[in-house]
Design a protein with these regions (language model features):
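Non-catalytic protein-protein interaction segments used by genome-maintenance enzymes to assemble
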Residues: 218-269
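Short amphipathic alpha-helical face segments that pack within enzyme cores
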Residues: 72, 234, 270-278
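Metal-dependent nuclease catalytic regions and adjoining charged, substrate-binding loops involved
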Residues: 2-11, 112, 116-119, 123, ...
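Short catalytic/ligand-binding loop motif for oxyanion handling, primarily in non-cytosolic enzymes
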Residues: 85-86, 256-258, 301-303
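Secondary-structure boundary elements
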Residues: 206-210, 237-245, 280-289
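Extended, compositionally biased low-complexity polar/Lys-Gly-rich tracts
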Residues: 166-197, 216, 247-259, 265, ...
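Hydrophobic/aromatic-lined pockets within catalytic cores
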Residues: 77-82, 224, 237, 252-255, ...
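Metal-dependent nuclease catalytic cores that hydrolyze phosphodiester bonds in DNA/RNA
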Residues: 2-230
Length: 368
């Protein structure tokens, strides 16, 4: 689906955006710590962090619908010419819904898990993929009870699958295994969100200023507290004359008017700290200004707006947040200290706090 015609007049721009895509792939392949891995450690604990990011025993976490839409909007907003290199549009996804859609997506997940890029084959048969995917979707993983396709057998659903929309959907996914599949409905929504974003003058200016260098999908690699780290920044302004750098981060959400809570619950303050530190090291002597969020509604109901952060917000990212209830959200510095402790001691099945207190701690008190 060609959203932008690649004519001679925009060939240079297209090549530049392809270069951005190549750098992004290089970024994804780099195993350095980033906001997502540090957030995983904080939210899910050291063992999950180890299995997912060190031992690579876990599949990457599935993005939420809002995050999927955010990535699509980001592409159409900042590197639209590369849409065909990143995404493919399938029509079947609009007709395959509910548990049927879940089954096809689980099949594709297993296909990718066993896929050999060199010869284009899978290490298990299609029948094995279908049966395993069906069981994964049908049965509750804890109780073993049927929660989807109740009373059905995998053989009966295979008959429905063959020659129908489900098979078309699956085939379209497999044919584009290296790309992200989206529906026409999703693309239309993303395009409308982009229009809404650019209709706000102060946001339109971010992507069209002439007095600064503008970089989209800007990769950073650096070291901090003994760790190799990385960040992929949505948009960066650099003013070499006045020596300042401004970072912008696009967030789409179902609840844009309560974004302060989203910043807390999704631990975006950690991302602010990671990116700020990377920019500080990349641009010594420059003023690194606190992040500005570009906040857009995933359903395109609420007008987009800019959410500014301050040096106080940035301090929270490094040092943590203490809530009136007593709940403490750890900052980047403390989390890196704890991660280093786990590496030094090769202990991943408990936390540093529990281990150093001989397996006895006082539980957090909430509600006061």
């Amino acid at each position: 689906m060609n959203l932008v015609q690649k004519t001679t007049s925009n060939t240079i721009a297209y090549e530049k955006q392809l270069e951005i895509v190549a750098k992004e792939k290089e970024y994804r392949a780099n195993s350095a710590l980033n906001y997502s891995s540090i957030k995983d450690f904080d939210e899910h604990g050291p063992l999950e962090f180890y299995k997912r990011h060190i031992a690579k025993e876990r599949e990457p976490r599935k993005e939420s619908d809002a995050m999927d839409m955010g990535s699509l909007v980001d592409c159409l907003l900042t590197v639209p010419d590369t849409f065909d290199d990143r995404y493919f549009v399938h029509t079947a996804n609009d007709t395959v819904k509910g548990q049927s859609k879940e089954l096809v997506e689980e099949m594709f997940k297993l296909t990718k898990l066993h896929y050999n890029e060199e010869d284009g084959t899978t290490s298990i048969t299609f029948g094995e993929i279908f049966k395993q995917a069906f069981e994964n979707v049908q049965l509750d993983k804890f109780t073993g009870e049927q929660v989807k396709f109740k009373g059905k057998t995998w053989e009966s659903i295979l008959e429905v699958f063959n020659g129908g929309p489900m098979e078309d959907f699956y085939n379209s996914l497999v044919e584009n295994v290296s790309k992200k599949g989206v529906s026409i409905t999703q693309v239309d929504m993303a395009q409308n969100i982009v229009k809404s974003i650019l209709s706000v003058p102060c946001i339109h200016d971010i992507y069209n200023r002439m007095d600064v260098e503008i970089h989209n999908q800007y990769p950073l690699y650096f070291e901090y507290q003994g760790f190799k780290m990385k960040g992929l920044l949505d948009t960066v302004h650099i003013n070499h004359d006045e020596k300042w750098v401004q970072e912008f981060d696009l967030k789409t959400s179902w609840s844009t008017l309560n974004f302060g809570y989203n910043r807390l619950s999704h631990r975006y303050y950690l991302q602010e700290a990671v990116y700020n530190k990377g920019l500080e090291l990349a641009f010594p002597g420059y003023e690194i200004r606190p992040r500005k969020y570009i906040i857009a509604d995933s359903r395109n109901h609420i007008m987009p707006y800019i959410g500014n952060t301050t040096l106080e917000h940035l301090e929270q990212g490094f040092l943590g947040i203490s809530m009136p209830s007593g709940k403490v959200y750890k900052g980047l510095n403390q989390l890196l200290t704890e991660i280093q402790w786990h590496f030094d001691n090769s202990i991943w099945n408990t936390t540093m706090e529990i281990y150093e207190n001989s397996n006895e701690i006082t539980l957090e008190l909430f509600g006061e």
